[in-house]
Amino acid sequence: MSIIPSFFGGRRSNVFDPFSLDVWDPFKDFPLVTSSASEFGKETAAFVNTHIDWKETPQAHVFKADLPGLKKEEVKVELEEGKVLQISGERNKEKEEKNDKWHRVERSSGKFLRRFRLPENAKVDEVKAAMANGVVTVTVPKVEIKKPEVKAIDISG
């Protein structure tokens, strides 16, 4: 059982991970000044703060993001300078018709952008992305580490 997740919002992450580009926001828990700004923050917070899991297997680095309601055309997966994986997207608000009467608006809208610095063992030319059931999965294969060849030397004498 780890203490770190309870201190940092229950997320499974390593605060000492040199590859993460997440930025700590010291003001994220402060209430916003105006109530209208507060409502805007509540409306977009769930989507804008998209959490992404990153696990490393013996063969690859695997990133997974839950993006319910988005189509694959609304999501971008890009590599910057062959070193930084960028996952972004946007969900627009539903258009309001003149005669519509809304009783509740709970689905979030807005943009999100997450960036991850890839480690040296990433095969950036073989990155694959797929989307199924609102989950984007990005697989970055790892370079196979070859074990050094060991040659036995006969001892004379």
Curated annotation (Swiss-Prot):
Gene3D superfamilies membership: 2.60.40.790
Cited Pfam families: HSP20
Cellular component GO terms, alphabetical: cytoplasm
Disulfide-bonded cysteines: none
PROSITE patterns cross-referenced by the UniProt entry: SHSP
Keywords: Cytoplasm, Stress response
PANTHER family xrefs: HEAT-SHOCK PROTEIN 20 FAMILY MEMBER
Family: Belongs to the small heat shock protein (HSP20) family.
Subunit description: Forms oligomeric structures.
Protein name: 17.8 kDa class I heat shock protein
